[in-house]
């Protein structure tokens, strides 16, 4: 296992880019950065915010970057000149607490909402998933989720998997041609696992980061654990990338509790190791 980069304030939302770099959000400094396999780091997007902010992102099939502006309840789209425009207004579907995003191969963007601000100690409320179609219209397509977190879409575009952190499970939905979700079911009951960011591989297995248990876990549909990577720090998200997508990247840092999310200094890092199967699907 190697450290690809260090000095991250609060890393999240890793994505393997078309430019052969690992992109990730650093919530603590309100930016999206990219790092190549030699560890060369570049700040790609700086968001105009004066305080700690949740940032998640993904790309449309044509390469345009979408960024979730959680506080404003908007899905932003970055233009060729780096300017940001509103791609969709998300607040018609739920109150601001927007979290993760995944875009499938058809250009359907799924954005989930925790429905409460756990960092402020708000009382739990069930969350939801909104669908943003390629034309920028948004509507709710799933509800009643126990802290929806990382999401992934299988390579056939037929299944969306969502981590329910508070329910300790991965939940799956069928995806219709128009992006609607149906046939909700438990994809994997994780026992004591607490899933955060997730990704899927070409053998049909899923990886999930686990913050309180300080590990990254590969699991099969049905819940069988295939591999556990024990870590010294909490794993907030994971991504399969590299030239053949056979490298597992893990975003890790010390977890100080929800009330101290902005107080972690620069102790975050991204670790990498070989994976048993290449990445597949989205992200």
Regions found by a protein language model. Name each.
Residues 31-33, 74-76, 127-130, 169-171, ...:
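A short loop-to-beta-strand structural motif that recurs across blades of beta-propeller domains
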Residues 239-283:
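Blade-level signature of beta-propeller repeat domains, shared across WD40, Kelch, NHL, RCC1
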